[in-house]
């Protein structure tokens, strides 16, 4: 604070409901969830000194959305996971941002992942996998000399590719243990 006093902790409240579907005849799991999160005691720009960099407490952010995920064992060796999430986030109480989407919170995110595990071969226990993630567009705010004090610009969505190689150590007497290398953001 401007007076040097520490802020109170931020508080959150979450409501969530979900379902899980596992068909009897297929090696598939499908989940869906809806949620609402509310964060109180968020820091917001000091209305008395908006461009000073000082904050006051009292802002509130609400996020509502849903998530979908499907996992399938395509074969004894191949697993595929696909996921999608939608988030509608908004400052519901804030000095400058009320009614706006919080910075760096995408509305849409999606991912697709596949892995192949070797069984009963010389490579038994080895898993290789690859996937892609999509992060939708976001908004970012910056300070300006305008009467609004904070302006915004959109940041375009982007996709990332990831990969993994891991080895199950069960054959060495360490069931449940593995070693692996993950490479994120390959391109």
Language-model features: where?
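Extracytoplasmic low-complexity repetitive segments enriched in small/polar residues
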Residues: 1, 28, 38, 42, ...
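Outer-membrane beta-barrel translocator domains and adjoining extracellular loop/strand segments
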Residues: 1-5, 42-51, 87-99, 139-148
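Membrane-embedded beta-barrel scaffold of Gram-negative outer-membrane proteins
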Residues: 9-66, 73, 85, 89-91
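Conserved C-terminal beta-signal and adjacent last beta-strands/turns
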Residues: 15, 103-187
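Gram-negative outer-membrane beta-barrel transporters
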Residues: 36, 56-143
